[in-house]
Amino acid sequence: MVVIVAPSPTKQDPDPNAVVAFDQLVDASINRPARYMGHELGVEPRDWEAARVRWALTYPEIYEVGSSNLGHIILYSILNAVPGQLCDRAYLPAADLSERLKERNQALFAVESRRPLPAFDILGFSLSYELGATNILAMLDLAKVPLYAAERGDLPLSHPESPPLIFAGGPTATSNPEPYAAFFDFIALGDGEELLPEIGLVVAEAKAAGLSRTDLLRDLAVVPGVYVPSLYGPDQQGISVEPLEDGLPDRLLRRVATPMPHYAMGLVPHVETVHDRLTVEIRRGCTRGCRFCQPGMLTRPARDVEPEAVIEAIETGMQRTGYSDFSLLSLSCSDYLALPAVGVELRNRLADRNVTLQLPSQRVDRFDDDIAHILGGSRQSGLTFAPEAGTQRLRDIVNKGLTDADLVDGIRTAMQNGFRKVKLYFMIGLPGETDADVLGIAETCRMLLDRCRDLGRLNLNITISNFTPKPHTPFQWHSVSTAEFLRRQQLLREAGKRLRGVRFNFTDVRLSAMEDFVGRGDRSLAPVIEAAWRAGAGMDAWFEALDRTYEAWTGAIAAAGLEGRYRALELGGWGRANALSEEGLDAFCSQPLPWDHIDTGIDKGWLADDLKRALEAAVVPDCSFEGCSSCGVCGPDLGHNVVIAPPEIPVQKPRQAPPSDRVCRIRFRFSKTGAMALLSHLDLVRLFERALRRAELPISFTGGFHPLPRLQLALALPLGVQGEGEWMDLEFIEQVEALQVLKRWQQTLPPGLLLMEAYEVPVSGQSLSQQLEAARWSFELKTQ
């Protein structure tokens, strides 16, 4: 065995475009080093020299978050399928690697090619959270790219000293790009599946022609769905923006694309990720019309995926990846009418693979026995529903379309199907909310406990979020004070003390106030964002960073002279709708907003009318299943709702526990060398288990709630240690030939893991740990 020791750091500045000396940067002294390895299962070699345009899609979060983001992986896969285009990935490194990069004057690098990010033509950032721009600035700084678009010069992209084009996409960038506009050369609005390849073609032609950066951006500005902030400036009122040159659209329409589930099979990371499963999108868009919900407004029309395409993607993806779990994704999964049929068909086809289906938060009014039967598997977990409000009046105001009877029926159905833990999401601070509505949350919990008592013990986990108004929603004109949030939280805490079996979790109000201030801001916030980042803001969605984040943001806001504006918003400065006459409300809602130039397809007048309906607690039906609400989306530009009729539900095969017979035990000697030494023991075991699934070997599983392969490793190697003679046992449900198993399993393992020997041992014999006598170690010592 050999302990890997990193050589002393180089004293010379590295070549800005050369492949990074990865082994000198990442070693066992770095926390969770395997997340930086790249070359995951599913990565294919790319020809750097042959590519006409080179992308790096960056997710401004740590690897475990970014690598499991479905949109990130889909766009990466699509770009790599386009001839002449190459796409790599990058993520925000943790603090220890960030410091090492700075110490060694090394630019942040992409995980596959391991080339510095300035070597790419285009760097794309996913912006899905109002405070996420601080992470983007941290990555730009680590990449040695100027923070502001205006500082990146006018050299052609083909020039070796030209910085990459920097762009943002994602829901936050689409809804209101103005607070972040100064940092980006362009913004990709809406769905990127078709838009990004088009951008790549324009960039490739501009590179070949030697166009300046300015001319290239002018060419990009005429691509539908591309917003170039430098070509737009404030209008006469200084709130909205308008084109600075002729020929540019006054309003920029977002792009809409059809979901492509076969691109979701993606990659299998070496480490455990936040969403450690195969995920396939079944429906894009939501037409429920919840008045607080920005994703529902930004993704219309609703588009169902063909059931057979979903089934094929899951079946093929589970075989390719070896995952034990899969998830079907949509803003409202239960509105995908084919869900029960697709779920049963998948359960039947994958019945012998010991897999579990998971769904995100669902509509409780559509949760029935058909959906309950397809959930879970050998590892049934809890369920999540989102009533949002505690009274019928307030649910009507927000257009939730949910009654107490729906809630009771859904929870009882869940309990009748074996679920005992249910998570419920509520919000406080919604427009029109009173103390009675807040206390109604506790009353709703009490009602559910009482109405379900005959079915056994019910455990409720309640998450209370603070409502923050979002652009392009009917509630974009509203605001609630921080003081009111705190008072209402305390009101609910007191009421919740009397409830047994109910646990309340509250969102920090400081975070909500900052999200609101930035999310509805304008271009004047760019220096505030930079100042907050320099003061220590970053990883702002993480609870551990909250105190530091709050101090950094409030300090930056005060230093910019915007504290008065921040406090006015915090005190409810926009929450005047209830007090206005109809004429006054019309005038109030017609005032310009910083995001008016972004055309989501929904008419601003319709949003104002829907706000009026909210004040009257009037409900608007779901236009996917009832009449058109005339929001303005459907038409030749954005298309129409695509709702697929539900197929017949197949007969479901009985659930069966994974096979646990112990017929044959094979002992393996293996080596773990090279980069695999950076893999922790738990990650190694997970890698072996997934490889076994891909090899489709007749393995034996343990019993109990969480069945696992009967795989035993003799020793857990310390992180960073290579092993040249490790041992493990694996048991099978039938007699197998050791050499054939070795060959079949080896085909599914990555370089650095080599099965060297295999032979049968008695099933009832001693375990490996009992038979170990000694281990031989060798150390390579290097002087600094």
For each feature predicted by the language model, list its residue ranges.
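N-terminal pre-triad scaffold of radical SAM enzymes
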Residues: L57-E61, L79, L267-Q294, M318, ...
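N-terminal [4Fe-4S]-dependent radical SAM core
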Residues: V26-A56, Y63-E64, P229, P234-T279, ...
